């Protein structure tokens, strides 16, 4: 009887794990992450919200996400609080989460910074592993490569040698790159060594810049109608070569596509329509969604139960598009500011004030910022880092005018 106990226990454990996986598969659909051999949930976790809550709330939010079948998280945020909160929330369940962690994103002087300095990148990466209580991450994501010059400098660099060293040491299992530039992303896809591309994809960003879309009869039968030709090539290449795209800015960045007033297209999409649009691309493995609290997570999880009618975005797509450039998506890629101004937060509060009117609550939030728009020197350093061609100095002038400093 004693000899039967251990095998029986093992069988029961396997059955329990199988039942749990089956339950998740029933509720959540999974897709291959390119050629990595990993299966990832169709919707996944953006990490920004974990900076705004405490460890207890982080645990509650992560538990709900995991129990619902979400198994992928993008960790671009180098803020020690964010990393520590996620590490705490994953205690005992690390093996249930696939981590896409960024290499070359550090937290310096209270701001997120992009770096290609090997020592800085190494310190930032080791800090991430320590705070996550893990010895590896599944996807090592080279942080923000948006220009041809940045890509050319990356290839053959000591920084890239370090990335390959991490893979050889088993600290990362797969190599990815994040980009907002379709031409650069296509270069990355054709490099032969990139397995995952984190790319900004949504109905607005896919449109031809500044051009009218010929919505002729039958055009909606081809979901690529009206998409920038370089993006078409990128999506097709990734699909045929089994390179995964993990989608950022699914809802337009800060949910801009969900409100006709803020949408660059002038029409409102639902979250389900945005997600369905992205997942219509065979190359897309998962849509990363920013989640600030349990209510937002619950709303995102409605995707699992959404009807075909709720997912249908074709009626909205028939609207004439506007230019998607020039609108801030609060992504923080413009940082660091030489004056310490939290540019993304200033722009977020400015947009709210212009849409809703300046309220005492908005003024109080602005006043509490460590630095204000009036300190902007118009040095222009942020402009070269903004993927969306936002006129940041002009935005700062507007914020100073509205908020008074």
Please describe what each predicted stretch is.
Residues 19-101, 162:
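N-terminal binding-site loop/beta-alpha segment at the start of enzyme catalytic domains
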Residues 34-37, 67, 87-98, 129-135, ...:
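Acidic (Asp/Glu)-rich catalytic clusters
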Residues 52-65, 116-133, 179-187, 269-277:
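Short, acidic/polar
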Residues 50-56, 74-84, 108, 115-116, ...:
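Acidic-and-aromatic substrate-binding clefts and catalytic sites of carbohydrate-active enzymes
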């Amino acid at each position: 009887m004693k000899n039967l106990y251990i095998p029986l226990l093992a069988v029961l454990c396997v059955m329990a794990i199988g039942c749990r996986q089956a339950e998740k598969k029933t509720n959540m659909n999974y897709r291959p992450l390119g050629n990595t051999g990993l299966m990832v949930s169709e919707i996944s976790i953006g990490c920004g919200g974990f900076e705004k809550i405490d460890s207890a709330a982080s645990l509650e939010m992560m538990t709900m996400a995991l129990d619902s079948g979400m198994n992928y998280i993008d960790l671009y945020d180098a803020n020690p609080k964010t990393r520590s909160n996620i590490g705490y929330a994953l205690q005992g369940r690390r093996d249930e989460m696939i981590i896409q962690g960024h290499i070359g994103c550090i937290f310096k002087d209270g701001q997120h910074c992009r770096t290609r300095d090997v020592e800085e990148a190494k310190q930032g990466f080791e800090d991430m592993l320590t705070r996550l209580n893990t010895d590896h991450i599944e996807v090592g994501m080279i942080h923000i490569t948006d220009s041809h010059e940045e890509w050319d400098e990356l290839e053959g660099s000591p920084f890239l040698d370090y990335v390959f060293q991490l893979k050889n040491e088993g600290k990362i299992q797969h190599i990815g790159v994040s980009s907002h530039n379709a031409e650069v992303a296509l270069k990355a896809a054709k490099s032969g060594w990139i397995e995952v591309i984190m790319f900004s994809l949504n109905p607005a960003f896919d449109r031809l810049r500044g051009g009218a879309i010929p919505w002729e009869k039958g055009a909606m039968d081809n979901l690529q109608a009206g998409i920038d030709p370089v993006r078409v090539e990128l999506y097709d290449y990734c699909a045929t070569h089994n390179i995964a795209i993990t989608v950022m800015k699914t809802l337009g960045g800060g949910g801009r596509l969900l409100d006709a007033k803020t949408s660059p297209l002038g029409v409102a999409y639902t979250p389900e329509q945005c997600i369905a649009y992205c997942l219509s691309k065979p190359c897309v493995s998962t849509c990363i969604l920013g989640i600030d609290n349990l209510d937002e997570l619950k709303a995102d999880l409605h995707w699992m139960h959404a009807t075909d009618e709720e997912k249908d975005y074709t009626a909205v797509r028939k609207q004439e598009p506007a230019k998607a450039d020039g609108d801030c998506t609060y992504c923080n890629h413009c940082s660091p500011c030489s004056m310490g101004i939290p540019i993304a937060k200033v722009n977020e509060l400015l947009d709210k004030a212009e849409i809703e009117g300046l309220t005492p609550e908005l003024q109080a939030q602005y006043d509490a910022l460590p630095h204000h728009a009036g300190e902007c020197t118009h040095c222009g350093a942020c402009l070269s880092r903004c993927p969306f061609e936002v006129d940041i100095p002009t935005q700062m002038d507007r914020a100073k005018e509205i908020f008074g400093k």
